[in-house]
């Protein structure tokens, strides 16, 4: 049975509107509390949030629902998604809830659940929780929010863990950090200052409404300018919940998740720590990355988009490294989810050991032209079953003759069809992606 509430990254929506209205959020807490009671007599549940203004009332409603089922709730306050995953798997928690909509605007929010092992819940368990939510909504009760007190030691515990992972010292290194006015706004500057870095911060002043606003991992212009203006050795931008990072080299060039995977994959292989000489990525990763891995004797395995699917394949294969072009990178030895700050630590360490900057680490990576077009759609059903869409995709694939790629899929979190076309010629890529998007827009656009 297909899920209606849970997407590729939990439940997402506009805060205050279904499925993040007060009744449904409270029902989510009740449903999760019932699920948790199956695993422990007095389950402890961790809650964390990013900096959105809706985070507090959502947390209190979730907590109220959990408490109604006998669960004990502990609140970390503002913390990153990987912070919640880490604390959940290392503490006594049955589950952890992160309240965030990642890179989305401030008026969106979301609910992401981690099991006691620190992994996102499997689809079948999400479906059971979802079915209970629907049952509860048939006879709703007045939500009873629970006032929460932030337990700062929880955040300190996560920061201490990160600080101890790497032997890297950043004395004499200038790092520019864009926290996207999100969950990392305190933690990232403190982490890198503690390692000796001279830290330049931008967009580290959240007000509840400026998260991801022209800043962070999806808007790199300000960071690029800051790196060049302050002559920083590295720049790093996090998204709203800091489960991903995108980097900027000292020359102001963007270093995305594909380049990070290549640098980290080769370093792990050289150290004898790349299990099976395999790296897991997604269908969005560039052809150039696949060919660079081939040249290095590393196999790249692709999954559907979503770090959840990357991690599932990593576990299945026993892989040590996986990630996405968007900047989610998973080091399985240290984390059960993408962690932007951990990725930064590892990448800076690799650059330091190589005695180079970020530009030089992946100078041989040839990026094929790639274009992504988003088309807003009426509903997310039957995209590839539409004859006109299927015909246009076949036409483009035939024209490429095996030299390019076409990927058409629905977004897991928004009412969008995403068209990705990649090939050796930019003009051709732009033409083909536009033609496919036009057909989709005509067939099922809003």
UniProtKB/Swiss-Prot annotation:
Keywords: Isomerase, Magnesium, Metal-binding, Phosphoprotein
Binding site for Mg(2+): 102, 239, 241, 243
E.C. number(s) listed in UniProt: 5.4.2.10
Broad EC category: isomerase
Highest rank taxon of the organism: Bacteria
Catalytic site: 102
Sites bearing Phosphoserine, chain numbering: 102
Substrates-to-products reaction catalysed: alpha-D-glucosamine 1-phosphate = D-glucosamine 6-phosphate
One GO location term (cellular component): cytosol
Gene Ontology terms describing biological process: carbohydrate metabolic process; peptidoglycan biosynthetic process; UDP-N-acetylglucosamine biosynthetic process
Post-translational modification summary for this protein: Activated by phosphorylation.
Keyword Glycoprotein part of the UniProt annotation: no
InterPro entries named among the record's database cross-references: A-D-PHexomutase_a/b/a-I, A-D-PHexomutase_a/b/a-I/II/III, A-D-PHexomutase_a/b/a-II, A-D-PHexomutase_a/b/a-III, A-D-PHexomutase_C, A-D-PHexomutase_C_sf, A-D-PHexomutase_CS, Alpha-D-phosphohexomutase_SF
Signal sequence residues: none
Note accompanying the cofactor annotation: Binds 1 Mg(2+) ion per subunit.
Pfam (any one): PGM_PMM_I
Transmembrane segments: none
Cofactor: Mg(2+)
One MF term in the entry's GO annotations: magnesium ion binding
PANTHER family: PHOSPHOGLUCOMUTASE (ALPHA-D-GLUCOSE-1,6-BISPHOSPHATE-DEPENDENT), PHOSPHOHEXOSE MUTASE
Family statement drawn from the similarity comment of this UniProt entry: Belongs to the phosphohexose mutase family.
HAMAP family: GlmM_B
Role: Catalyzes the conversion of glucosamine-6-phosphate to glucosamine-1-phosphate.
Protein name per UniProt: Phosphoglucosamine mutase
Gene: glmM
């Amino acid at each position: 049975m297909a899920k209606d509430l849970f997407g590729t990254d939990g439940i997402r929506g506009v805060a205050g509107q279904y499925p993040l209205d007060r009744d449904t959020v409270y029902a989510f807490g009740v449903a999760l509390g019932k699920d948790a009671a199956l695993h422990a007599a007095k389950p402890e549940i961790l809650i964390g949030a990013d900096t959105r203004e809706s985070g507090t009332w959502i947390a209190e409603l979730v907590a109220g629902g959990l408490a109604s089922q006998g669960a004990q709730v502990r609140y970390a306050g503002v913390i990153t998604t990987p912070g919640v995953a880490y604390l959940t798997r290392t503490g006594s928690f049955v589950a952890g809830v992160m309240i965030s909509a990642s890179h989305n605007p401030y008026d969106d929010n979301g609910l992401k659940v981690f099991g006691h092992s620190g992994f996102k819940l499997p689809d079948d368990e999400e479906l059971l929780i979802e079915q209970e939510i629907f049952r509860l909504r048939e006879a709703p009760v007045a939500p009873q929010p629970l006032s929460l007190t932030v337990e700062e030691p929880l955040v300190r515990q996560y920061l201490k863990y990160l600080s101890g992972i790497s032997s890297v010292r950043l004395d004499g290194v200038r790092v520019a950090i864009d926290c996207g006015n999100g969950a990392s706004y305190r933690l990232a500057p403190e982490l890198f200052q503690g390692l000796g870095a001279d830290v330049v911060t931008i967009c580290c002043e959240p007000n509840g409404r400026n998260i991801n606003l022209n800043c962070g991992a999806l808007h790199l212009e300000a960071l690029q300018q800051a790196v060049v203006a302050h002559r920083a050795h590295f720049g790093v931008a996090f998204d709203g919940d800091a489960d991903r990072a995108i980097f900027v080299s000292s020359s102001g060039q963007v270093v995305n998740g594909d380049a990070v995977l290549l640098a980290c994959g080769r370093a792990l292989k050289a150290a004898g720590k790349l299990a099976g000489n395999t790296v897991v990525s997604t269908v969005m990763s560039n052809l150039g990355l696949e060919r660079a891995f081939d040249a290095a004797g590393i196999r790249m395995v692709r999954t559907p988009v979503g770090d959840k699917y990357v991690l599932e394949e990593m576990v299945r294969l026993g892989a040590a490294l996986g990630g996405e072009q968007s900047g989610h990178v998973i080091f399985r030895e240290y984390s059960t989810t993408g962690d932007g700050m951990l990725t930064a630590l590892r990448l800076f360490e690799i650059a330091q050991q190589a005695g180079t900057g970020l530009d030089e680490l992946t100078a041989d990576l040839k990026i094929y032209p790639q274009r992504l077009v988003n088309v807003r759609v009426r509903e997310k059903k039957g995209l590839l079953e539409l004859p006109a869409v299927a015909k246009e995709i076949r036409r483009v694939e035939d024209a490429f003759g095996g030299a390019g790629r076409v990927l058409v899929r629905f977004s897991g979190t928004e009412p969008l069809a995403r068209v990705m076309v990649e090939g050796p010629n930019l003009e051709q890529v732009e033409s083909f992606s536009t033609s496919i998007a036009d057909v989709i827009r005509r067939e099922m656009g809003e």
